[in-house]
């Protein structure tokens, strides 16, 4: 019942903001008058159930201060800014009051009969009120038959001489005397409480027994004939001797839970002049039925042998926040019923196989926040009842010592890899380690009966690719957040890591730098209900990326620009806050869906905002209108069509260029054929003029066969009627018996053009070079470009420049080069024909003005 009232009070303390009740007002049941500068109790309705008057300036409370409030259950008068005077029967008009809170108010005067008439008062709070011993000695609490909780902490009480009326408070279960100045408590002081069973009794932070000399023979047992469920004597600065004497003094009293936290027992680290608890320290508690012993927040350095030997009923032992560095052999001997052992926040560096002997029923061992780096193999193997082992935040580099137990906590260590051991567990917590290879994940997913696997804040970024997934029918929750899975998956390996997890219900992949999701990576997760992908770099999410039965998706803090709403229609809850939405018409479909969907959108609307364009930056998507985007869609279609037309045209153009370039010879032949067919361009001779030949072909006799096949058969009329040129060349047209130079000169001057076929043989033939020189001479004489030079073969510029006669021509005139690709021969012959047919400009005629002799006058 008391727990329910505590919960009720907590609700009341938040009544203003929760129920929307404005300050200094009431709604018929709750009167909310905190911080209202009141100097007296306000008048409220008789239906009021809770009256909150804290943080005001009320000075006096008398019997007439309150109207008759039969339904009032909670009165809060604490934390007044002025000293408070409470007169006789000040609360008699509140007959059904259950909780009276006067805490943190400086009580200037409290009448001994102030609380008379509160027959139903359940809890009385008088903490930090400046009260003295008189409140206990003078019967202030008599007749409070329903009183269960009495809080007198943080006052100025120095002794616990209780008024005999305490013996009649049969409902009293909890008394708090903590943070007073009670230096000594003896048997006769608490005599009115003898025979009672108290759920809580606190003497914490009083410097009890530590500032005075105690004659334990006279003081005797302060809790004689009492049963205490929780006895709190923490924070009193007890040494080993004081603790031992106190244990002996209360040896015949029942104290199920003994809190001795914040003590000064133990040598600490580096000191030897203060004793650690030994075999005699807790010997007096042998018959006290202690089940829970709290020795946390002290300086114990060494757990000595059999230090807890007499505590046969102990089930929970809390040794956290000490300086324990050494556990002696048989330190836990005698703790046959211990179930929970807390050794967290100590200085343990290594554990040995003998450390936990004597704990046959221990189910939970907490060793977190030590410095453990080495653990012997058999340390936990013999603990047959062990259910949970907590080794978080140590310095472990291997786990070969881990037994098969349901819950294993190993986060915050230095694990880089895991040994291949036979392991069975329900929960494995391995976050904040240094695991890198996904082979470790494959191994852990094979652990039988595993239900929860936590691997957050590791370094998973590589994959060997030689692992195969195996069926795990038990795993329900997998935490892989804050790793680097993008680096592993971008190698196209380990995409099958989730294949065997047909019963997985919750998967966390947040903070993994994911740019995209591997195809089908979730396709086998048929039972998945919740998926977290928040704080990644996803820009696109397609329907095939998500499991079919997914209900809850967290994809917040990604880089989604314009998501497709069809991806989310099957969800129940969606968190899409803090993405980088581009608020243009492409987003209109998603905005419309967002405003009309039945899917629960997590997070405040202000967190779903635009980042572009700048005019909409920071604007919530729920505030945007999509009007005008229909015309934009039409324009978009038009733009797309225009894009397609331009793309096709450009593609055809490029393909045409590529085809013509690749098959240019064939294309040229087709062009010439079409020209003849369309324009009836039949071969015909050249126009008659003053020249006997159209061209003189000058070449080396060693090249005759090639010249005949390559040129003469395609150009010379005597080789074919289809040809149009009357050519001159040495082998046919030179007059036998005549001087060779004369033949050359005659051929040069009787031909419209001179075509020199310069090959390697040409450069070695003196007559050819001589003919080239004569041809240059004609060009100089006629001031025209009758000489056509054709380079045949792979002759370099340097080879041509070595010959003086050719050097001058190459430096000043253009020349042709016989094509290397056979398909270019037709085009080349056409170009050569055009050069032969090309007429030179007529030379200007002289005016033929005769010169006359000019007479000189002397």
From Swiss-Prot:
Subcellular location, principal: membrane
Family: Belongs to the Toll-like receptor family.
PTM remark: Phosphorylated at Ser-805 by PKD/PRKD1; phosphorylation induces the production of inflammatory cytokines.
Known disease link: Systemic lupus erythematosus 1: A chronic, relapsing, inflammatory, and often febrile multisystemic disorder of connective tissue, characterized principally by involvement of the skin, joints, kidneys and serosal membranes. It is of unknown etiology, but is thought to represent a failure of the regulatory mechanisms of the autoimmune system. The disease is marked by a wide range of system dysfunctions, an elevated erythrocyte sedimentation rate, and the formation of LE cells in the blood or bone marrow.
Disulfide bonds: 583-610, 585-629
Localization of this protein: Cell membrane
A Pfam match: TIR
Lineage of producing organism: Eukaryota, Metazoa, Chordata, Craniata, Vertebrata
Residue list for modification Phosphotyrosine: 798
Cytoplasmic topology ranges: 661-858
Protein name (Swiss-Prot/TrEMBL): Toll-like receptor 5
Known partners and oligomeric status: Homodimer. Interacts with MYD88 (via TIR domain). Interacts with TICAM1 (via TIR domain). Interacts with UNC93B1; this interaction is essential for proper TLR5 localization to the plasma membrane.
TM annotation in the entry: 640-660
Protein species of origin: Homo sapiens
């Amino acid at each position: 019942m008391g727990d329910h009232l505590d919960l009720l009070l907590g609700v009341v303390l938040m009544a203003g903001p929760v129920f929307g009740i404005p300050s200094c007002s009431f709604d018929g049941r709750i009167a909310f008058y905190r911080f209202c500068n009141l100097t007296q109790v306000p008048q409220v309705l008789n239906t009021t159930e809770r009256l909150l008057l804290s943080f005001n300036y009320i000075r006096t409370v008398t019997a007439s201060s309150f109207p008759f409030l039969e339904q009032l259950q909670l009165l809060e008068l604490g934390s007044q800014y002025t000293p408070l005077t409470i007169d006789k029967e000040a609360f008699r008009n509140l007959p059904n009051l259950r909780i009276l809170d006067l805490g943190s108010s400086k009580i200037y005067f409290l009448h001994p009969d102030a609380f008379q008439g509160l027959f139903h008062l359940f809890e009385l709070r008088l903490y930090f009120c400046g009260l003295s011993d008189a409140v206990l000695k003078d019967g202030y609490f008599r007749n409070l038959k329903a009183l269960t909780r009495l809080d007198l902490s943080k006052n100025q009480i120095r002794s616990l001489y209780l008024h005999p009326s305490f013996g009649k408070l049969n409902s009293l279960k909890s008394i708090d005397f903590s943070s007073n100045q009670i230096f000594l408590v003896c048997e006769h002081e608490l005599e009115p409480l003898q025979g009672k069973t108290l759920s809580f009794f606190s003497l914490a932070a009083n410097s009890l027994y530590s500032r005075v000399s105690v004659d334990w023979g006279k003081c005797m047992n302060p809790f004689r004939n009492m049963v205490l469920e929780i006895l709190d004597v923490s924070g009193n600065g007890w040494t080993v001797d004081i603790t031992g004497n106190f244990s002996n003094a209360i040896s015949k009293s029942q104290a199920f839970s003994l809190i001795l936290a914040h003590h000064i027992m133990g040598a600490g680290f580096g000191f030897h002049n203060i004793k650690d608890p030994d075999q005699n320290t807790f010997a007096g508690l042998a018959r006290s039925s202690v089940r829970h012993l709290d020795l946390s927040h002290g300086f114990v350095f060494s757990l000595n042998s059999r230090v807890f030997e007499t505590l046969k009923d102990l089930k929970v032992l809390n040794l956290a926040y000490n300086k324990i560095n050494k556990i002696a052999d048989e330190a836990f001997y005698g703790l046959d019923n211990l179930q929970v052992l807390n050794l967290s926040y100590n200085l343990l560096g290594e554990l040995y196989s003998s450390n936990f002997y004597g704990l046959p029923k221990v189910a939970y061992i907490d060793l977190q926040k030590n410095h453990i780096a080495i653990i012997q193999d058999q340390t936990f193997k013999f603990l047959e009842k062990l259910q949970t082992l907590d080794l978080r935040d140590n310095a472990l580099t291997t786990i070969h010592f881990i037994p098969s137990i349901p819950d294993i906590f190993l986060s915050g260590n230095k694990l880089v890899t895991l040994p291949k051991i036979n392991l069975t567990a329900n929960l494995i917590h391995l976050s904040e380690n240094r695991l890198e290879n996904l082979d470790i994940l494959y191994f852990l997913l094979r652990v039988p009966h595993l239900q929860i696997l936590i691997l957050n804040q590791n370094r998973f970024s590589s994959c060997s690719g030689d692992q195969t997934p195996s069926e795990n029918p038990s795993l329900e929750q997998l935490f892989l957040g804050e790793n680097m899975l993008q680096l592993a998956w971008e190698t196209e390996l380990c995409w099958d890591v989730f294949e065997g997890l047909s019963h997985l219900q919750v998967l966390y992949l947040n903070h993994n730098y994911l740019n995209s999701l591997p195809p089908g990576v979730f396709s086998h997760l048929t039972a998945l209900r919740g998926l977290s992908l928040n704080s990644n770099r996803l820009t696109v999410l397609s329907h095939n990326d998500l499991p079919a039965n997914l209900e809850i998706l967290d994809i917040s803090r990604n880089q989604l620009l314009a998501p497709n709403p069809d991806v989310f229609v099957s969800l129940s809850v969606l968190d899409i806050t803090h993405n980088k939405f581009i608020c243009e018409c492409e987003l209109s479909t998603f905005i419309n869906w967002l405003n009309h969907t039945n899917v629960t959108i997590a997070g405040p609307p202000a967190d779903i905002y635009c980042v572009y364009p700048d005019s909409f930056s920071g604007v919530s998507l729920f505030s945007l209108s999509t009007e005008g985007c229909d015309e934009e869609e039409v324009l978009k279609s038009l733009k797309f069509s225009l894009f397609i037309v331009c793309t096709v045209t450009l593609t055809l153009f490029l393909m045409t260029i590529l085809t013509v370039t690749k098959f240019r010879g064939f294309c040229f032949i087709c062009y010439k054929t079409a020209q003849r067919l369309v324009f009836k361009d039949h071969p015909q001779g050249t126009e008659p003029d003053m020249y006997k030949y159209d061209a003189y072909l000058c070449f080396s006799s060693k090249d005759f066969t090639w010249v005949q096949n390559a040129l003469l058969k395609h150009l010379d009329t005597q080789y074919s009627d289809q040809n149009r040129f009357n050519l001159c060349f040495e082998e046919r047209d030179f007059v036998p018996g005549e001087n060779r130079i004369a033949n050359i000169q005659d051929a040069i001057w009787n031909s419209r053009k001179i075509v020199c076929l310069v090959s390697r043989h040409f450069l070695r033939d003196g007559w050819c070079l001589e003919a080239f020189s004569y041809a240059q001479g004609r060009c100089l004489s006629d001031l025209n470009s009758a000489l056509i030079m054709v380079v045949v073969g792979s002759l370099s510029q340097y080879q041509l420049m070595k010959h003086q006669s050719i050097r001058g021509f190459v430096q000043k005139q253009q020349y042709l080069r016989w094509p290397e690709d056979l398909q270019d021969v037709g085009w080349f012959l056409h170009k050569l024909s055009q050069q032969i047919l090309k007429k030179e400009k007529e030379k200007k005629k002289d005016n033929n003005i005769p010169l006359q002799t000019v007479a000189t006058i002397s």
